[in-house]
UniProtKB/Swiss-Prot annotation:
Residues 936-972 are annotated as: Disordered. It comes from Orgyia pseudotsugata multicapsid polyhedrosis virus (OpMNPV). It is an enzyme of class 2 (transferase). InterPro entries: DNA-dir_DNA_pol_B, DNA-dir_DNA_pol_B_CS, DNA-dir_DNA_pol_B_exonuc, DNA-dir_DNA_pol_B_multi_dom, DNA/RNA_pol_sf, DNA_pol_B_thumb, DNA_pol_palm_dom_sf, DNA_pol_type-B. Keywords: DNA replication, DNA-binding, DNA-directed DNA polymerase, Early protein, Nucleotidyltransferase, Transferase, Viral DNA replication. GO terms for molecular function: DNA binding; DNA-directed DNA polymerase activity; nucleotide binding. Residues 954-967 have a biased composition (Acidic residues). It catalyses: DNA(n) + a 2'-deoxyribonucleoside 5'-triphosphate = DNA(n+1) + diphosphate. This is DNA polymerase. Transmembrane segments: none annotated. Replicates the viral genome, host DNA polymerases cannot substitute for the viral enzyme in this process.
Amino acid sequence: MKILTYNQLQEAFRDYAPRDFAVSRDDAFRVMRIYYNEGGGNLVAFCNAQLGGRLAQFYFVMKMDLYSYKPCHNSHIFATCRNRCSSYNTFVAPGVKNVYMDKINVIKFKRNGSSFGEKTMALDKFLHNANRVHMQTPVIEGTYLRFRRAQRCRNNCVADDARPFALERFSDDFEVLDPSTLTTNIAPVMACYDIETHSDGHNSSKPECDVIMCIGLAVFKNDRFEKVCFVYHSEAVEIPQASDDTYVVVFNNENHMITAFFEFLKTVNPDVILDYNGDVFDLPYIRGRLKGDKPLLRRYDLPAMQPNTKLFITKIGNRTDTYYFNYYIHIDLYKYFGVDANKRDVENFQLNTLSQYYLGDAKVDLNWQTMVEMYNNKQLGTIIKYNVQDCLLPIRLFNKLKLTDFMYSQCIMYRLCTDDFICNISHLISSTFFHLALTNTRADPATGLTVSDPYFFNKDDLGLMSSKGSAGLTTGMSRLRRRRIPLKDVPATAIRLGAIDENVKYEGGKVLQPRAGVYEFAFSLDFNSLYLTIMIDICACLTNLILCEDGNVYLNQDKQAINVQLLLQLLKQRSELKKCRDSQTESEFLYDLYDQMQNLSKRTANSIYGYYGIFCKLLANHITRVGREKLTAAIGTVEGLSNDPDLLREFGLSTLTFKVLYGDTDSTFVLPVFRREEIPEEGRMATLGRICAAVEARVNGLFTNGYKMAFENLMSVLILLKKKKYCYINNNNKIVFKGWLVKKDMPVFMRVAFRAAIEQVLRHQDLSKCLDSLKANMLMYLDAFGITKPLTDYSFSMTYNDGAGKTAADDDEAAPPKRRVITVARHCREILVNKATDFVPGNGDRIPYVLLDMQGNVTQKAYPLRLFDAQTMRISWLKHMTILNTFMNELLEIFGDEHKDALAECYSAILEKYMQHQAYDKKRAALVKIATKRKAPSASDASGKRARKGAAPSDDESGSSEDEDAPCEPKCANNTFKFCLYKAQ
């Protein structure tokens, strides 16, 4: 460690960011961040360039007007409007061309110089200024540019007083570059900070009274980390010099430390500032220490600015502020992992878990109480190391996951901005529709020329047609103020979707209930992008909706509709991007860029159906209806090929039948039945592969309008349990689990043991090996508990939500206050608060816990894993055995009653060992005839019972099916018995 004063630190970094240099007309640079100054009417663009093998940073200012849109409320009696408004076709249900089109009158106004009240009326208020710049100019974050004339950067600013940059002269001053012409990536400068807070050791840290002990900062530039730690201590401290390359500055005034940290950001000049849960903890805590003031952020010689905040609401209703840093890109990486469904394969979103999963690395292990004790004893070296390590990991994660390319691809392709990094897909599509509506064109049928055909996307219309009406109020699309089109004027090809005032209930795709069992040589036949193909085929677009006088909504078949053209463009775009990606044999930079862009094309196209499911269920339901029809037709076609003469002759078989075992939305599992001796084992998989390809070709020969099925997998062994729950060995001899043994509410060790057991069935088709493996692993993990295996392998976890979601309106006569429901998560959090641990979970955090073997219900037994001591506390295996009970019943469903005795023997052996030291939760298992009507077990006798009527939904029940809310279907299993757990006498 290098112990310096703050002035010495500034001197050490004096040349870290060069201020004066030349930029030639051959030098490419990249726009990293833009900020629009509404007061001055100019755009500030922050850019990076590689000059002489070193990263150079600068900014330029461009004079421009930025526009927004607001409704015009003029009566429009005369031919011209005094407000000079423009009339646009409405995007949602506009009507029928050449008959009647609903219009919205819109005033385009300058944001620079407009009043606050005018901006609050804007119809595009869901956009950031950067979005507007992206839509109205060629300056887009992430794009590569080049100056048309050589420039000189002075004090980090490229400017020419004699010829200031202006939007109307953009093409004279700048050249937009195609990334494919470049050989190297220009990366942003990355920074990440983290704070460590003090406490009295009995309560959680509170900004009103507990100081910030230190602020760590890591900066990544030119493939190198710089590490700095700002430390506060009220007394003189000595930190020994060490070989570590961390710069350490000690302050005896906390406010001076905080101010110095934010000043130093200007010195190292990052483009991206990361934190981990900073929106919820670090930034509010810093504000608390500053008596509620927001810190000032400076960059270059630009005016200092405070961060802006905006309310961020998660899908489950949790509400937090998001901080925007104006001149810098600020990303709370914790939120990214929380909202991105693609990251749900990790156990939780703690930084340590993510680092181990993606980086194979972990945090420095330092107990919070130990840290506070060290601080009080002036032993700061380990604290500094811990603090700085927490700053390195988020940057490494960001780079490992190639999130820079993802962030800028969203900007270039969909006019999002860097502040939209954690936006949901709904915002992405709304922003895209807004831009496409204003710039829409179509081919003139008379001349064949492309002509302008603008629409206006009014996001308020989405809320109107998707909101649920109260009693006595209009519902559905009748809330839209649209003139009804006479039935005679509705095109004959239009599709009737349903009643205008219908309160639509969403109906999903077709799912066949499979018969549980083990099957050999099944294959899957899936539709290629089924819902996307349907949307193109039926011309699914909000501009094609027609509200008719007969009380129904119709879907016009205009193939030039905005969404149809978007989907066709995305399909073509993805195909071209994949070709570009695969052709990159030398440039890793271009390979990663094209890969991120093609993935984003796929994600967007696949999400538009879900967008309709939120805002226009009538249209979404019709799409799923067509999907069900296509899947039904495919099943009939496949099974109709049984003993087809051409197939029998081609493959030299006497019999070949096809049975569809399972179907789900856009896929089918097909079992070919043949005489084994007619297809020799040596070449069986190859022959079956050719049969699958022949079936694919025959099925696709009957489909038109772009519908295609593809042979996906020939599964040497398939285990079907129930709908959406199965596993198989794929073409590459890899085991794949879908919906089964994957949920996070199951402890890791049980998932490992169950999967290992099922692998014996998949690899050897041997139940005895399956049960031997299950027994051996379950007993091994029992013996290793608290000794060689981490406690996290045995724990459960639950998301903490307090006060999330909507609140019911108060009546005149207020109802008696409801009893506060204590969930497992809330119970564990209260224990953590009372014990003053280093981490108190907030809304949306998952809390790992175990059950204690003690008197009480499951909630009362729950205890946070962070505080559990295996040497002094006794764990309850009650919940674990309930999960085991579910798994044994699943095996019974698959293998049937004839194997119930072998299953019972294995189950009893495991249960006996786990119950041997239990004092309060001893259980025994019994086989029960399913058809036998029995008296419901008492509260003390049966585990896994349902919650009583009137109780809150239980957080304690395990093994509950994800299909619980689905309609009942005929039982399709092999067993008439099931296992139940009872209290041991």
